[in-house]
C-alpha cells in the first residue's frame, strides 16, 4: 500500500459532492450574484476532491504512526522476554489483532511482512521496504537504527529497547502539543467562516450598497480577487 495516496470511498465522494455544490452556490450568490457561475462546479469539485485526498493521506499516516508505535512496544517487550525478532514480530501480529481487530493498517502490513519472512526474506529487508512506503520519519528512522544494530551485533536488544523508549517519548510529546494547539485550530476554522457571514449580512441588509459590485467588470475583478485571497488563506 502506498501511504502517500488515499483511495476515496463512496462516502467521501458523496461528501465532496455536497461540499462542492454548496460552495459553488455560495460563490455564485455571494460573490457574483449570477446563476451562470454554477458552471464552475466541476472546478470546485476537483478542488474539494484534492483537499479530501490530502486530508485522507494525513489521517491515514497519523493512524499508521499510532499503530506502529504500539507495535514497537510489543516488539520490544517480546524481545526482552527472549523472543527472536522474527518470532517477536509474529507475536505482534496477534497483539494487533486483539488491539484493533481487522480495522488496522499495521495488521495487514505485519501479516504481509510475516509472509515475506517465511519466504526467506530478511526482517531488515521487509522492514526497510515498509518504511519507504510509509513515508513516515519515525518508521524510516527505526528501520535505519534496526539495520545498524543488527549489523553491529552486541547489545542489540538494549538498542531496540532504548530506541523504542526515545521514540515513544517523542510521540507522547507531539501528542501533547497537538492537544494544546487543537483549540487554536478550531478557533482558526471558525474565523475562516466570518468573511462569509459578513458578506451574507451585507448582501441581505444592504442590497443597494452591494449591487455596485455585481454585473460589471470592475466588480467581477474585485470579487474574484477577494475570492482568491479567501481560498488561499
Residue spans of the language-model regions?
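Hydrophobic alpha-helical transmembrane segments in multi-pass membrane proteins
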Residues: 103, 124, 137, 141, ...
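Juxtamembrane/interface alpha-helical elements of multi-pass membrane proteins
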Residues: 42-130, 140-148, 155-157
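Hydrophobic alpha-helical signal-anchor/transmembrane segments
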Residues: 1-70, 171-233
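Hydrophobic alpha-helical transmembrane segments
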Residues: 125-145, 160-178
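Hydrophobic residues in alpha-helical segments
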Residues: 30, 79, 117-118, 150, ...
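A short hydrophobic/aromatic micro-motif that marks alpha-helical segments and, especially, helix-coil
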Residues: 96-99, 150, 167-170, 198, ...
Amino acid at each position: 500500500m502506498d501511504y502517500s495516496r488515499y483511495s476515496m470511498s463512496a462516502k467521501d465522494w458523496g461528501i465532496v459532492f455536497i461540499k462542492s455544490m454548496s460552495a459553488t452556490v455560495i460563490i455564485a450568490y455571494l460573490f457574483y450574484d449570477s446563476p451562470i457561475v454554477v458552471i464552475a462546479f466541476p472546478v470546485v469539485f476537483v478542488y474539494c476532491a484534492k483537499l479530501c485526498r490530502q486530508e485522507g493521506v494525513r489521517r491515514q499516516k497519523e493512524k499508521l504512526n499510532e499503530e506502529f508505535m504500539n507495535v514497537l512496544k510489543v516488539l520490544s517487550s517480546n524481545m526482552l522476554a527472549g523472543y527472536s525478532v522474527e518470532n517477536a514480530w509474529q507475536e505482534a501480529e496477534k497483539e494487533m489483532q486483539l488491539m484493533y481487530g481487522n480495522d488496522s493498517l499495521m495488521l495487514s502490513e505485519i501479516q504481509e511482512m510475516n509472509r515475506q519472512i517465511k519466504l526467506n526474506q530478511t526482517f531488515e529487508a521487509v522492514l526497510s521496504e515498509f518504511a519507504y512506503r510509509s513515508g513516515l520519519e519515525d518508521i524510516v528512522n527505526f528501520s535505519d537504527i534496526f539495520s545498524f544494530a543488527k549489523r553491529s551485533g552486541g547489545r542489540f536488544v538494549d538498542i531496540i529497547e532504548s530506541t523504542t523508549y526515545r521514540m515513544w517519548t517523542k510521540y507522547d510529546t507531539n501528542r501533547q502539543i497537538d492537544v494544546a494547539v487543537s483549540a487554536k485550530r478550531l478557533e482558526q476554522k471558525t474565523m475562516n467562516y466570518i468573511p462569509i457571514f459578513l458578506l451574507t449580512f451585507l448582501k441581505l441588509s444592504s442590497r443597494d450598497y452591494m449591487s455596485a459590485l455585481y454585473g460589471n467588470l470592475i466588480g467581477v475583478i474585485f470579487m474574484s480577487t477577494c475570492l482568491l485571497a479567501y481560498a488561499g488563506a
